[in-house]
Every structure is written in C-alpha cells, then in structure tokens.
C-alpha cells in the first residue's frame, strides 16, 4: 500500500466534511442460549469505500504507517482473524479473531485527540486506522487490549483527518469503548452495548436521561378538560424519540430499539434480528448533503452492515449492492494454513432479483 493512498482517504474526509463520514451505528444483542452478537453499520456518503474482506493467518506480519513514512510499529499475528476493510486492505473497520475478540472503529470527529507523534518512538506508534488489525492480531480479550494500549502510541497520519473511537468486545460478554481525549486513552465499560459517533460516549449515556419519559407500547387514553385524548396509533409511548441521523439521535434510537427487542432463543435468529434493527439506521444518499451537492453515485450511504456472533466465532455482512447475508465461520478456517487474502465484499456489485413465474 502506498502512503499516498491513506493521505488521499484522509483528505477526502476533510474535504467533504465530518458530517458525511460519521453515521455509523452499533448495537449488541444476547440470545437466549447466551450468544453475544455485536452488529453495526458503516456509513460514508462521500464516495465508494471499495470495501474488502481480509483473511489473516497466524504469523502474518504487518507494519504501521507513520507521518512521512511506512516504518511504524511492526506486529505479527498471534491469532488469525477475519476483517472487513475500507479503502485499503490494511484499514480494517470491523473484525473478529479466532480467540473470540471483536474490534471495530467508529468515526469520532471534533472531540478526540491523539498523542502527538514522536519520530523517536515510531517503533511503538500505530496509525489509528490500523489499530483494529493490531488488536485482532495480538490480543485475546478486552483485558489484553487495555494492556496493549498502555504500551503503544496511537497516532494520526494526517492531523487534519478525523479521529476515531473503538468498540472492543470478547466472549466473556465484556465490552468497552476506547477514546483518546487530550492525548490520553480512556476506556469506558459499555454495558448498554450501543455506540455511534460524536460527542463522547459518556455524554451519549448522559443524554439518554433526556428521554426518561419514553417507554415501549402505547400511552393510555385519558380525559383533559372534557376532551378524550387517545393515541393515533401503536407505539405512542415512544412519541418524542429523535428521528434525525445525527449521532446523538441515532444513539438514543439504537438504545431503545435494542433494549425493547424481544430476545431470540438462538444465536442465528439473534443475528438476523440485529440486521432487522439496523435497517432503521440505513441512511439514503442525499440526506447528508445540500441539494445538488451529492458527491457520489452509490446506492446507499450505508455501505455495509455486519453482525458478529462472538460466542460462535462467526461474522456476517451484507452490502449496499447486495442485501443477501454472507457469513464467515472462523471455526472452519485453519489459520495455521490459510493464506492471506483480501477480496471485494461483493463478487458482483448488483442486487439479485428473483423473477417470479406464474404458470
């Protein structure tokens, strides 16, 4: 990969503005048989991300980019993993390793700040867009992620580019959010299991208190001044839930949709449920841009949606080109023998349509 590629990606995000890059939504569901499923959208309306899946075997060596070069931290995969990457195969946005650790990045513009890059410490410096591969390669659980972050320096290749924050979850059920504030890493326990973008995670949790009046179901009829008041339809207990696509509003909706969803008995049914919930967070091309200013001819700003069954080591995805759900079962992959590969998420970038025949 060329250094110019990451700079082009960063400058693209800068030129189009943070609003078009920051609409990813993550949720968490637990099945009746105890499987933990983390799911998310990846949204970018400014261009086609040319997303790929990567299969990374044990022993695979990678090196991070740093400002002005490609000679940052070197790391070798102790654990094999499957990742879903954007723009370049090195930029894994979501992935799962064979130990049962899930990792994903979400854009976090205008609020985070990494430590300043020190060339004397480049051997322990990793680009933010390459932290997910590092974590999946070298950590087996959230505790090891915390230890790793204490030993390394996460940096921006270009200081003009947006920062990101991360979601890490393991098969014990523990999930954390990592944010860098004023150059310092901060971990938050994510018991709710929801994540979007800016502002910070702690603010998003506090903001939920503004919606303490919301509840599942319908508000009861009642009299007011001799007038009988009745709901127009079902679901009036959620009247007032924010409906726009900004990160705070999506966080609130995701929290309520996730926590009110009926628990499914088994893991795969829970995976399918997560895709259904995330249908509500698909963002059509155009809503994030002024009229006549849409920069890309793509079918959706939601370029792909993934669901990871951490317990059973499976990662599922569908794309803006093909809504059929595809699955990698890590239990069927021999990471001591498989070769590294990076291939497009879609073999054919077209939605199949079944033509019904009436006889």
Predicted regions and their residues:
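A contiguous strand-loop segment
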Residues: 23-120, 160, 359
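C-terminus-biased signal that marks the final domain/tail of proteins
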Residues: 22-37, 45, 51, 148, ...
